[in-house]
Amino acid sequence: MISLLRARLRQGRQTLDFPAGPVPLPERFRGRPVLDGSKCQEGCRACVAVCPTEAIRTDPLAIDLGACLFCAACQEACLTGAVSYTPDYRLATRVREDLVVSGAEAKLATALDDAMRSLLGRSLKLRQVSAGGCSGCEAELAALGNVVFDLGRFGIQFVASPRHADGIVITGPVTGHMELALRETYQAIPAPKIVIAVGACAISGGPFAGAASSGDGVPADIPVDLYVPGCPPHPLTLLDGLLRLTGRIRAGTR
């Protein structure tokens, strides 16, 4: 016991002061891309050619973050600097179309309506379903529970039973073998409920889009309340999206 107490005193406080404090990110972190179509050379489609998920289009230049793997192959292929990645981790949106980036403007997630926020704003229980994922997004979601991010201090927890949940977090491209399980889990969650799509696979199918054994993300008849792009998204991207959805981070404050 004494050794544990000494270690605790030596290590100090490890939990990030988020969202109020500074946000430490790795030097190589790739966040929101910034595009400048005026730098594009006429007829050049180098970035389009190297994108593994066809997330980029030209005329006008735009990137679909819902399909983007953040591999930065487009940035390396662009000789004029029209595409660059910033350390901005704020990527989550409420609307699928807002994930299409065509400049430097960021369209961030907004809060739930007053009625839903009064129910879920301070206590949100989520059931996670890995619908054919590679465990990348699942690992980042699990990291939210460690001492650094401490998701529980915001009243947000993952639960084992959909009957105890207020919403569902979906990862993976939704393979044929997982679609029924996903639908049954969604149906088992009491209304009103929310749906959160995490990662490129859940949003668009990611690199598996169009594959015979997988879908193109969350089925169209399941309404999504929050999209969190990335491959996988950083825990801070996930936390930022959840706090914006529940009204803990208000629009224009950060």
Kindly label every feature range from the protein language model:
Residues 39-53, 67-80, 127-142, 200-207, ...:
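Local cysteine-cluster metal-coordination motifs and their immediate loop/turn environment
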Residues 111-157:
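Conserved small-residue-rich
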Residues 139-141, 146-149, 153-239:
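Cofactor-cradling patches in redox/metallo enzymes
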Residues 1-50, 54-59, 76, 81, ...:
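Non-ligating segments of multi-cofactor redox enzymes
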Residues 204, 242, 252:
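Long C-terminal interaction/binding lobes of large macromolecular proteins
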Residues 59-68:
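Short linker/helix segments within small regulatory modules
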Residues 238-246:
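Short amphipathic C-terminal alpha-helix that caps PH/PH-like domains
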